[in-house]
UniProtKB/Swiss-Prot annotation:
Gene: argS
UniProt entry tagged with the keyword Protein biosynthesis: yes
Gene source species: Treponema pallidum (strain Nichols)
Subunit structure: Monomer.
Catalytic activity: tRNA(Arg) + L-arginine + ATP = L-arginyl-tRNA(Arg) + AMP + diphosphate
InterPro entries reported for this sequence: aa-tRNA-synth_I_CS (IPR001412), Arg-tRNA-ligase (IPR001278), Arg-tRNA-synth_N (IPR005148), Arg-tRNA-synth_N_sf (IPR036695), ArgRS_core (IPR035684), DALR_anticod-bd (IPR008909), Rossmann-like_a/b/a_fold (IPR014729), tRNAsynth_Ia_anticodon-bd (IPR009080)
SUPFAM superfamilies with a match to the protein in the record: Anticodon-binding domain of a subclass of class I aminoacyl-tRNA synthetases, Arginyl-tRNA synthetase (ArgRS), N-terminal 'additional' domain, Nucleotidylyl transferase
Species classification: Bacteria, Pseudomonadati, Spirochaetota, Spirochaetia, Spirochaetales
Molecular function terms, GO-annotated: arginine-tRNA ligase activity; ATP binding
Protein name: Arginine--tRNA ligase
């Protein structure tokens, strides 16, 4: 349908250019706004004419009528639809037969590649997301970050880009030493294996324990952790050995959560391996005169050209800042995998940080610094409010997943399906993943959100499990058709998309036809919620079609055949769109 819409856009632009006359610059198709009418009875596409009416000295309604007359005389366009003047708009009723045939042919020819576009063909795009600390497990904020980063990576790859997913592991600094300090003092040699606690949670428990210790003995705690940090900086072998052990524990558990939620990376970077490069670059910038040094030997950058004040890049004792390691990491990445664009998926509390980071890298003379982009997103909380790792009030990602899994199991048991389903445990896990990812991705990334586990698991309405239910229902229908064919033999009926003219069929065909444009729009806006919104629209269109248009009990074989083809097309697009937003497709539920 997008091709037909563009065809009409260019046809309208061509006629507008004729009306303007040769003395005026021709109208380009891209200048024409194309909208979807609010009601089906008003057509399929609409062109507002307010802007162009002034150029030809007519009212918008007069211009719409004249355009309609001229386009009706264009026999080459008559096969693709009918123009109609609607006040200040030129509306077009597309040729249903043409759109249905074109859309279904494209879906069956391309299969699960349908929707793939060339928008980013040839581009190399690196995506950074997750960025965990090795002193605690992943929490709900990481779940939103991971979902956005992984989904966005899949979407831009589907638009033709070569995508490289990276993760910076924050494995050094005061916060890491806090867990190490508490472990040294209070663990008495315990390990995750001894306690049966998941390894990242085991490390996180010591981070909480340190903060309890610091509340009781603040001076001693401050001294202990600073001493540990200095010994780490000096490469004390005993401190480094403990650091490696606890980091390995934390990272092992974090990787298990990644695997559980379908998150993967092409390369991991570690702050402990990049911060020294950042320090070297800051000192080089000082030597080049782009930074300046204070009397205490700390190094700063002037941000007045950004409308800001100044920013410290290196402390007076030569120790690094948070921004220092990001400078080094960015340089290593550009060397490792030269990119056309690097997207940082990081929460909006870091907006200032990335504005400064990109500016600093430009000052250092790196041309690729112009290609850095911060994909900022809002905070996510649970209904009981904000969470704090140091107080132990954070709800781990695994806790949320376990809770969703248990609730999905209960729902399966409630429906009496646990015995009928061969892999009920696996299905419950996939339902939990669908509930989580759809809920996190249905909100525009820029907005703050509250994650409601119970709402996310609903099998009715705008949820991941509902989409899975729809997919399973379609699969069940097609399986039954296949069984009938095997028993009775195939029907000698030609499937003709031209028969799909019922209003519910037409709305479903148009929904399928819009998918490629939705993928491109999601990539352009770095916004997976475009796809989740599309899936909700598709599910509503299918439900209406399923209710209004009989399939198995349709007495006319040719109509039944055409509708079955439409159902098959829906399954293909549904599966593809669900994959882009990390929702497992289920054949049965």
């Amino acid at each position: 349908m997008q091709d037909l819409c563009e065809m009409w856009r260019h046809a309208v632009a061509r006629v507008l250019s004729q009306l303007q006359g040769p003395a005026v610059e021709p109208v380009e198709g891209a200048q024409l706004v194309m909208e979807e009418p609010p009601e089906p009875g008003m057509g399929d596409i609409a062109f507002p004419l307010f802007l162009f009416a002034k150029r030809v000295r007519r009212s918008p309604a007069q211009l719409a009528q004249q355009l309609c007359t001229l386009l009706e005389e264009d026999t080459s366009m008559c096969a693709y639809g009918t123009p109609q003047a609607r006040g200040p708009y030129l509306n077009v009723f597309l040729n249903k037969e043409c759109v249905a045939a074109h859309t279904l042919d494209a879906i069956f020819a391309q299969g699960e590649r349908y929707g793939h576009t060339q928008y980013l063909q040839g581009k190399r795009i690196m995506v950074e997301f997750s960025s965990p600390n090795t002193n605690k497990p992943l929490h709900v904020g990481h779940l939103r970050n991971n979902a956005i980063g992984e989904s966005l990576s899949r979407i831009i790859a589907f638009c033709g880009a070569d995508v490289f997913k990276v993760n910076i592991i924050n494995d050094r600094g005061v916060h890491i030493c806090k867990s190490m300090c508490a472990y040294q003092k209070f663990a008495h040699g315990k390990t995750p294996a001894h306690t049966g606690i998941k390894s990242d949670r085991f490390v996180g428990d010591w981070y909480v324990q340190f903060n309890r210790y610091a509340q009781q003995y603040p001076e001693e705690a401050e001294h202990d952790v600073r001493d540990l940090l200095q010994r780490w900086e000096s490469a004390d072998p005993h401190v480094r050995a403990l650091w490696r052990t606890m980091n390995e524990w934390a990272l092992r558990g974090i990787k298990q959560t990644y695997e559980r939620t379908g998150i993967s990376f092409d390369k991991l970077y570690f702050e402990s391996e990049t911060y020294t490069k950042g320090r070297e670059e800051v000192r080089r910038g000082l030597a080049c005169g782009v930074f300046y040094q204070m009397e205490d030997n700390s190094i700063w950058v002037d941000l007045s050209s950004l409308g800001l004040d100044k920013k410290a890049l290196l402390r007076s004792d030569g120790t690094t800042m948070y921004i220092t390691q990001d400078i080094g990491t960015a340089i290593f990445r550009a060397q490792d995998w030269p990119f056309d664009q690097l997207l940082y998926v990081v929460g909006n509390e870091q907006n200032y940080h990335f504005k400064v980071l990109f500016f600093v890298l430009r000052l250092l003379g790196y041309p690729w610094a112009q290609q850095l982009h911060h994909v900022s997103y809002g905070m996510v909380n649970l209904p009981h409010g904000r969470m704090k790792s140091r107080e132990g009030t954070v709800v781990d990602a695994d806790d949320i997943l376990d809770r969703l899994h248990s609730a999905a199991e209960e729902e399966i048991a409630k429906k009496g399906r646990e015995n009928a389903l061969k892999h009920a445990q696996c299905i419950a896990e996939n339902v939990a993943i669908a509930a989580l990812h759809y809920f996190l991705l249905q909100v525009s990334p820029q907005k703050d959100m509250v994650f409601h586990p119970e709402e996310s698991l609903s099998f009715n309405g705008n949820t991941g499990p509902y989409l899975q239910y729809m997919g399973a229902r379609i699969s069940s229908l097609l399986k039954k058709v296949q069984e009938d064919v095997e028993q009775k033999g195939p029907r000698e009926v030609r499937c003709d998309p031209a028969l799909l003219t019922h209003e519910a069929e037409w709305e479903l065909v148009k929904a399928l036809a819009r998918f490629p444009a939705c993928v491109t729009r999601a990539a352009q806006g770095h916004d997976p919620s475009v796809i989740t919104g599309y899936l909700y629209t598709l599910s509503k269109s299918f439900s209406r079609f399923y209710h209004d248009c009989p399939i198995l009990c349709e007495a006319r074989p040719d109509y039944a055949c055409a509708r079955l083809e439409l159902v098959r097309a829906v399954r293909i697009v549904l599966r593809t769109a669900m994959r882009l937003v990390l929702i497992p497709f289920l054949e049965e539920m």
